[in-house]
Every structure is written in C-alpha cells, then in structure tokens.
C-alpha cells in the first residue's frame, strides 16, 4: 500500500477495493474464507492500518521502521519478500492454511513509478511471473493445453487469475496467465500470480468504519548492507498539465498525421475558443510524426496523454479529434459528461462512446466550429 504525506494513495485503495470484490466472489464460489491482506511499509504508519481495514482489508501487515520512511527499492523488495514468505505471519492470518503455506496465491502492485519498480524485483525474489499494466482481473478454473507447460495435454488449473490488458493495437484484450509447469521434465510452481494495476481503473469500496480486521506488526530484518543508498530529500514534481482546472478538454490523435503542425494549430484554436486544456492519445507521445520542435515539445508530451497510460479525466466536455478509440484511451475519458468526436472514419470505435459523432476531416470541421463559437461569443458580449 503506497502512501505519501500522511495519505494513502488512491491507487492503493482502488487495488484494495478490487481485491475485496474478487475475494467476496471467490470465497462464495469456492466455499472458502481466504483473506485479503494489505501490506504497508514506512515509519510511524500505525494509524493507516485501521483505514485499510475500513477499505476492505481483512488483515493488515504493518512493517514500521525508520529505514522504511523513504522508498528504496532494494530495502522495500527485501521486506515485502520476507513478509510474503513468512510462515509465522501465515499462521496468524489463517492457522489452518499455515502448514501447507509456501507463498501467497496472488499479489497486486500499483502500475506507477514505485510499483513498476517494486513489482518486478519482488516477483524475481519470489520466483514467479509478473503481468504489467493490468486493466481487468478475473479468477476462474481453466482447462489449458500448452505444448511446453502441459506437455501438450489438457490440464486443469484451479483458481487461476486471468489478467487483462489491451493488446498493442489498443482494440483487443490480451489475457495473461501465470501457470504452473506440469510437464514432468520442467515441473515447477509459479506463485504468487502477480500483476501491476493501472491507477484509475478500479473503484475503491465505500469505507466502513465498523468493519473489523486484524493488524499484524512485522519487525523487518534490515542489515547494514541494505543501507548503501541514502535518501537525502524528496519533492513532488507537479505535472506540466493540469486537466482538473478546466471544464473542457480537446484531445487529438493520429488523425493529425497528414499535416501535423497545421492540424495541431487547428486543435489549439478550438481549445482556445472552448477555454479547454489539450490532451493527446498515447501514440502521439511517442513523437513518431514529423512535427516541428516547438509544436512537439509543447503538445506531444507524456503529461498530455489521456488513458490508462496517462490521465483519467471527467470534464464537462470532451472533444476527441482524429482519435479512433482504443480501449486504453476510452478508459481515460469515458467519465466525461458530454463527449464529441470528429473523425473521417464513420466506423471508428469511438463513435460508440460519444454523444455527438461528426463524420468529417478535422481540416474541414474545426474551422466551422471555431467560426460558430466566435459568433456565439460576439452575441454574448453584445448582450
């Protein structure tokens, strides 16, 4: 569970909420009573534990130590791995399960700057696999045939975590599985089934102050050799773009490709008339289109990305210009109150996501919209 300046980060509560929903269903289907365990590291963090229980944790494992005050990947990896493998903790969480305990069944991290580092190193320590940047989770029983993992034979895999993320096209789901090898020559287990979860994808549950749970205080085993890196100071770097202060957002995508500079200037003029912030789709941030340096450095930057790889927004008005509607982009703007899309492809997927779809080229449509907006402003000013 990530936290900063006295607050648990939203993505941690989002993950906890999804874990709660998954395990309420899991325990009902499998007639079990397995627990959702939240692990939190830091210094002077005891007060967080009750909040995590209110947000869905059955058990909170709290590692409170002065050397855990600031994030250091080496130490945090070591302590989380210690906790994950500790049979004494397992016996406190579920005595009946402790004898057969080896590793947790599942483990979730945030797909943010800290979680992306931490998830990879922890899963290496636990000798399992990692699915990154996940948008959807399902637990089910599967029957799988795989040439290597099952020696080409149909094999049952119980309580398997299906981890979903958009494929490289952005329009189809990729399902990632972390399965044991059952082939005799290479037989081995892969636990926990782990993933990092995109912030903003899941919703926290409503906190329940009356909810009860168990708090376990863990004494981390930190040695002098773990302290080679010292954190001297830290500061929060504010984003170059703040979507929250504007009621409207105008975004553009690869539809600008025929004339990047000219088309981006059109988008900027429309945004100006709407008093809107400017966003972009993920491919634009890769700077693969031949735009000028001034245009590229101003508009084609990661801070403007809308979607699961960027910002999740909910303005009163969202205008998508030349954006086809990949799933990862839709996830970032679908909470907008009113959505307008401008696209020459009448079969573009974004057509199904908007309130108004304008089938046309941006070069033709935007000048007409700008002209009409100017007329309306003149009427307002005259009145």
Whereabouts are the PLM-identified features?
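N-terminal glycine-rich FAD/FM-binding segment characteristic of electron-transfer flavoproteins
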Residues: 1-383
């Amino acid at each position: 569970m990530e936290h900063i300046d006295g607050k648990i980060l939203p993505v941690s509560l989002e993950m906890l909420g999804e874990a709660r929903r998954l395990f309420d269903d899991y325990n009902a289907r499998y007639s079990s009573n397995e627990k959702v365990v939240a692990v939190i590291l830091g210094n002077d963090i005891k007060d967080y534990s009750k909040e995590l229980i209110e947000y869905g944790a059955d058990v909170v494992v709290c590692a409170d130590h002065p050397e855990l005050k600031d994030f250091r990947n080496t130490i945090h990896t070591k302590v989380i791995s210690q906790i994950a493998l500790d049979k004494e903790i397992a016996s406190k969480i579920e005595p009946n399960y402790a004898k057969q305990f080896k590793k947790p069944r599942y483990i979730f991290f945030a797909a943010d700057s800290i979680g992306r580092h931490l998830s990879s190193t922890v899963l290496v320590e636990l000798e399992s696999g990692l699915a990154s940047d996940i948008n959807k989770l399902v637990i089910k029983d599967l029957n799988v045939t795989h040439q290597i993992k099952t020696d080409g034979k149909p094999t049952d895999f119980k309580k398997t975590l299906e981890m979903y993320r958009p494929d490289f096209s952005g329009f189809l789901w990729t399902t990632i599985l972390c399965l044991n090898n059952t082939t005799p020559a290479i037989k081995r287990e892969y636990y926990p089934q782990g993933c990092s979860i995109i912030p903003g994808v899941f919703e926290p549950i409503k906190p329940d102050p009356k909810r009860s749970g168990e708090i376990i205080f863990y004494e981390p085993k930190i040695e002098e050799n773990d302290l080679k890196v010292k954190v001297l100071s830290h500061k929060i770097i504010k984003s170059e773009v703040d979507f929250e202060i504007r009621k409207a957002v105008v975004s553009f995508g690869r539809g600008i490709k025929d004339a990047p500079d000219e088309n981006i200037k059109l988008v900027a003029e429309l945004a100006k008339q709407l008093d809107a912030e400017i966003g972009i789709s993920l491919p634009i941030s890769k700077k693969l289109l031949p735009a000028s340096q001034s245009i590229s450095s101003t508009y084609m930057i990661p801070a403007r990305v809308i979607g699961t790889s960027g910002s999740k927004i909910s303005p009163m008005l969202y205008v998508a210009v030349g954006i086809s509607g990949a799933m990862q982009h839709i996830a970032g703007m679908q909470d907008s109150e009113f959505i307008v899309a401008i696209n020459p492809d009448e079969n573009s997927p974004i057509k199904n996501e908007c309130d108004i779809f304008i089938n046309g080229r941006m070069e033709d449509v935007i000048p007409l919209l700008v002209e009409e907006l100017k007329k309306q402003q003149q009427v307002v000013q005259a009145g």
